[in-house]
Swiss-Prot record:
Amino acid composition bias (Basic and acidic residues), ranges on this chain: 697-736, 753-838
Annotated Gene3D superfamilies: Zinc/RING finger domain, C3HC4 (zinc finger)
Descriptive protein name: Rab effector MyRIP
Gene Ontology BP annotations: intracellular protein transport
Organism annotation: Danio rerio
Keywords: Coiled coil, Cytoplasm, Cytoplasmic vesicle, Metal-binding, Zinc, Zinc-finger
Subunit structure and binding partners: Interacts with prkar2aa.
Residues of the RabBD domain: 4-124
Composition-biased stretches (Polar residues): 263-290, 451-484
ZnF bounds (FYVE-type): 58-112
Xref: PANTHER family: MYELIN-ASSOCIATED OLIGODENDROCYTIC BASIC PROTEIN MOBP -RELATED, RAB EFFECTOR MYRIP
PROSITE patterns: RABBD (PS50916)
Amino acid sequence: MGRKLDLSGLSNNEAEHVLRVVQRDMQLRKKEEERLSEMKQELEEEGSRCLLLSKQQKFNEHCCIRCCSPFTFLLNPKRQCLDCHYNICKSCCSYSQSERGYICAACQKSRHLRTQSLEWFYNNVKSRFKRFGSAKVLKTLYRKHIIERGALSELPEVSAHEGSNDNGSICDGSDSTLYKQSEGHSMADTLTVALRVAEEAIEEAIAKAENYKDSLEKQNEARYLHEHKEELIEELATTIVQKIIQRGKRPEIQEEYEFVWPQNQKSELPSPTSTQNPLATQNSHSTSQPGAVAQSDISKRSRSAYSSDDSPEKGPEVGMAPGVPKSTEVETDIQNYSSLRRESRALSLPGWKSVDRLENSSASSVLQSPDGNWIALQSSQHSRPSLLTKRKSLVFSVLEKESGVVSAYDEMGSDSDPEDQGGWGAALLQFRRRLSDETYYTDSQHDPEWTFTQHPPITSPSSGQYTNTETLNSDSETSPSPSTRARRAPVMKKGPPETHLYPYYRHPADIVALPQLKPDVLDVNFNPHLGGDSSDGEERSEQVKRSRRRRKSKRETSEHSRAHNALYSAATAENSTVLLNAMMMRRQQSQENTVPLNHQTPDSVTSPDILTFNNMSPEPEYQNTLAHNSSAASLPLLSQLGSNNPGFAPQDPLLRAFPVNETLEEELKYKLSELIGQVSERDVKSSDFEPISEVGNKQEDRVSEKDSGKLRPKERRESKRESKLREMEKQSERQTVKLMDTSDAVRQINIERQMKKERERQRDIERQVERERERQRELEKQIEKDRERRREIEMQVEKKQERQKEMEKQLKQEQERQSEIERDLEKKRKSIRMEKRN
């Protein structure tokens, strides 16, 4: 095999006969591969299945990798295969005495496949010889054919990519590589050989990709080549056939490596020797001097039809002697042939490895063939050759897909979503915003940086919660204060309000549960000239500090649900408190104008927010219906004034009996009952305390009417009072009815919800029952099918028994016939003997 083979002395008929023999050899190999393809496919499927099972944690330690049966200590012990090193059971392996170990069934089958396909022979021969067998014969015949046509040798002894096991190489040293380029056969033979070459190339590419079991990219590549195998074979075969046809039509193009470009065209179209590495030639020389015509006996130069320099700027590698005119036909032929070469080169060198230096100092990269026999240059203008189909990395494709997926958290709602304005979401959002604003204002007033910067005033002095720096350092009479201002909710911090800052209110568990109100509260000041004293402001600031500290400590210990209840009850109590305080301030102003009193100085007047409780109580008949409002709305103004000023004495007998005028108290009760009736679950989301403003306007009108009616006799006042008392009774009854209705409605809603939930549960149970029934029906059907199969088997057994009986009868009859025949024969013999004796 290693010796030189010279077939130049063969005649044309002998060469055709040799080519037929080679073609028959290829056909036989194809049939053999088709016969072994089924076994290969089974082994591939088994290998992929075992690979998936082995990736599961500790699967092979407890179960067999082949039949998945669990291991037991005595009945089914585990044994390790010598080839695949997987744990297998007793039934899936056999003992090898020569190797003294166990081998599984799949590994035995793979060994059998290797022996039948002669893989060991080809691997050893390819490693020792560059070309052998039919490939060597085809090379010599093709070289002889080219020499006869007048061209120099294209394929010297070491000119092609020989003996390569590369996964995508077409010129790989196989027996069918050079046969496709010969012209001593028909077009059908050319097509079959081209298809065979393409199939071998793609099969080698698949085999090499499957060898890398650890690389996921190689596994995906092998899977892709398996799926598109037929398409790739057709494309590769068409390119091979086109190349053969073009070479047959244009014999002058075969001389492209025997000429050198003129010197004036070096800048535009470089010569082959200028773009090819001298290491790419083995035992070869080239005469590429400018201006010299290549000799016919030029030394053998490595001509690689699969050069890696695929730059579009590179012209066709055809050289002509200077002075020879170039015709248009030759130019078109060269362009067509170079385009065909580029198409075939794109699929020819997928396995060549880069041998660039680390510093990448060379202008063009260097590639090396897998067998180490060839080194070629690659132009820096194009990317390095890849596999037949260049696929994306799996990680890159997964990341690209995941980048367009919407996150599951984007579609989930939360109580912090600004678009969710209904229910507890809006209330909690509003509480948090106002809590942050309130803590900012209260904390920033004690910050020295805040005091030296310009900020708008926080709130009016009448609110009593926050003190402006101007009101603290100036007189209350001269300092202007806004008449009305939207005041922040004083209980935004989680915790109950202090008794010295707010009127008393009952615990939420003691009062009737009312719908939640928004904490937007109006701060009405009907006396703009009346403000708090500076000393009062300082005391309030200290009280604010104490309350803030207490709130912080309570916030850490209290639970979230109790904080919500405290916020709800505080907001409800504060709404009524602010309205009552505003009306009392107006009442006080009117009394100051009519009754001469000695408490006109601002020092004796205290803010309504620091008034104490338990100075008065409503009448007993209304105490039950309005307990949650009257307790929070008790008006201790006149008692506080009386305690501060001993000279103060009310003139009206009604005022002597009660600390506050009874008519005013009735009006307040009436207004509070209206407020309670207007508040409902529907007003929680949409109302902005519009009823409070309307009630305030009505109160102002009634107070003015009351002031004008003071000059009338007492009888009218008593009649009005009686009528108002009746109205109050009616309204209180209506109030109780409404509360009962709302409570009944809530109960009904809860009952309906529970009923719906129970119905859904019953439906789920019914669905489960139906599924179980369907499963039982399927089981019954399967049981019936099994019974029918058993009946059929029994019928067949009975038929067989009947046939056996018939056969036995026939045998008996034949035996009887034979016995009769024997008797007849004996009788005849006896008769014959008797005759002879006679």
